[in-house]
Amino acid sequence: MIFVNNRSVSYFSYLKGCLASLLLVATAAIAQDPNATQQLEQEPGVVAKPSILTKRFESDRTALANAFAITQYQRNYILPFSHVTNPNSLGNEALTSDNVDNNEAKFQLSIKLPLYTQEDSVEGLYFGFTLTSFWQLYNSEVSKPFRETNYQPEVFYQWNTDIRLLGFDFNAIQLGFNHMSNGQSGIRSRSWNRVMLSTLFSDEDDVYYLKTWYRIPEDAKVDENDTSGDDNPDINHYYGRMEIGYGTRFDNWGVLIQLRNNLEWDKNRGSVGITFSYPISPRYEAVLEYFNGYGDSLIDYNRKQERIGVGVQLALF
């Protein structure tokens, strides 16, 4: 629950109100100018350039024509060095609060495969998989273990909206099911299931996304060592209930900002992530990544963290 003017309202009522307000603003804009979606293209001598995501989807469409190809989903990167302020040692039995290292490597692999797509289009049903690992690479005292690994298999449908409004291409809407787990058991187990809804839009220089989710409820654990039941009943209060992202490029530099929030006024929590990138080849980029907040990993979901790391990623956009 969240509280507004001392009145308790459900998260869904609040979210519905926000979406309704956005719809009213868009409707009013169209009502004032029924040709708003076509003004840019109709100006004499001006040719509308394709937006970032329009070009990205076209590249995906070309790649998916190859039956042996897979495509990038979320970011793919490796940070050989990162420093984190408050790492949780619980994820590996060899680690303790005394020997866990604040310096570690972090990497993420993320792919998607089409299960069904419309002819000559990227609209369709997809399977996605994202793996994120936190490796105590510099911790020779305990044989350099993996402190935590998170797995995210998901299935989602992507609709290509192809709507141009107020200078933006509203490129796609995605709806799907996401399972996130650290693959552990007992007191180390962390997992949750969500129904995810995302919208993606962009212009020539910028890309935006808005993502929200509904957590599928689970029964409470009778005992913390039970193999069934909710591993983390309060995860929404820390990890959040929605995420907003913005990316842009200037003078070859790329910037990606990601914000998560729990939408609770009384105990507001969330996170901010900022990634700076610079191309070192057409395929690879050097990156500097900064994170502050909750949900850096599942084992750390309720611990406030600050992390900074350097590494390399596959070009994102």
Where are these regions (language model features)?
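Cleavable N-terminal export/targeting peptides
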Residues: 1-61, 317
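Outer-membrane beta-barrel initiation region
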Residues: 33-141, 145, 149-153
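Outer-membrane pore/translocation modules
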Residues: 85-94, 101, 116-251, 259, ...
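Long, repeat-rich segments with strong aromatic
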Residues: 243-289, 294, 316
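Short proline/glycine-enriched turn/loop segments at secondary-structure junctions
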Residues: 297-302
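Outer-membrane beta-barrel "beta-signal"
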Residues: 304-317
